């Protein structure tokens, strides 16, 4: 739970390659010894974590549910009225859930269709998603990509469910959410971008005002980066101690990052500071991809050194380094090889892999042969 307390939330994405969804990939790179059953247990058994909207669809501590009351209220205003077609089935859905327990859209015998955000879908699915967005329903569990819904009152602790909006004003809410988001990012630039999504009622003027209040209160600290003198960044003041800790850390540790890791929420900042341009190409047609379908950035020490396309065969338990693209000017030395070998070994352990191998496209890459060999010897 400590990682959620520090980051606030991690992003959920339903795309599920053989080596795990985004949320699992975030955790495997940040939590030593992480196994997917840990997240599943915290979400759907202990209920200490909750599927809900923050930046977009995210996973966050259940205790934070009251803090998102304004988001749910906004959704109710826009989509919760009787004139909104999916709400025509709301009472039927509530009654069925009350009588039958947790259900997914395929458990309802209703043939109506509706225009929805991404195109036409079943009306009952739109109803479930609307009731979820306004807080009446929660996700009981998932079966692969299918969501099984239940009434929120059956999932949330009573004290959390009945808690009032803790913020007395828009400004108090904005201060909380901006501070939380900075903590999730680690370092934030004030300019508009996807990294500020989901903060209700907060555009550039409100965000600037919140940053000013938080700075005056000593909760955030402006940070200057020598190589980028015209930009001011912000960090949580409580996190600045980690800058000193970095001096005593091993400078050559490596990790394979999730494509939607919090660190990558602001791609512009990553380009400025690390000189690393990353675009997730999962939704691009194969013919126009520069790299691959689901490619993970490779962070080693203080720089991004490569891009990694894994493939995992669940039957044979074989992890294949399907493809690997080194960044320009990267020189593989013994320390980097050892760090990458440890990261690859840890990635295999996360997947319970029995074997690690190179894909056909790179099977003669001597630098990677050395990394694989070192990983196997650990």
Where are these regions (language model features)?
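Long, charged, low-complexity, helical-prone intrinsically disordered regions
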Residues: 1-378
